[in-house]
Amino acid sequence: EPYIVYIDTVNRQIPQHHKLAGLKVKTSNLCSEITLPTGVDNEGNQRTAVCCLSSLNLDTYDQWKDDPQFVEDVMRFLDNVMTDFINRAPDEFAHAKYSAMRERSVGLGVMGLHSYFQQKNIPFGSVMSKVWNKKIFQNIQEKVDEASKTLADERGSCPDAAEYGMKERFSNKTAIAPTASISIICGGSSPGIEPIAANSYTHKTLSGSFNVRNKYLKKILQKYNKDTDEVWSGITTNQGSVSHLNFLTANEKDTF
């Protein structure tokens, strides 16, 4: 699938201290979540972008959304990973180490957005999903911003920010990665912020081929006593859709 990057929008949204330094984003990584300055910077040094990511599982959002320490702990983890890279990476990675040291850019993202909507019986793209989308990401952003300032007090601002008198441990703080593989490891949550492709499909791995079924749809089918191989076979045949299941309500069809 293609990844599309609107580079003008990216450069309008870069951190203020990078704007003041005259830094520009010229490209992204393949998956497009890493949008950091590369090439020669205002100091005449070469920068190579560094990818330091973690993703929160929105499938379990209700378990951690009100925990004031949760997001901060994840940001501490990313900061520790960044420090370890700077200290241990070989000299051949000099440009990447320099970039990491100056920016301390990390990327806290998510997976399981569609899974969260489905467990709440909220159709993807509905008014309610838009309300929850804004609420979720506003909550995460506020905690990420707070963590950056807390860590700046404890450990110092990153050099790029400190140069302009700004209290930020991290230049970039968030990034939405595809999470195609790790979402499977995390119990089959939906990938990134993407909708689930199908409710039933064959997943091919090095270990073999496996039938994957939507765990939240399974609960709905159990409610109707329809959690049978025959029903799941029909869903698979119908390209993972439930549009042909007449016993489902209109909202349930929209949700799944």
Where are these regions (language model features)?
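Long, C-terminal-biased catalytic regions of enzyme "large/alpha" subunits
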Residues: 1-256
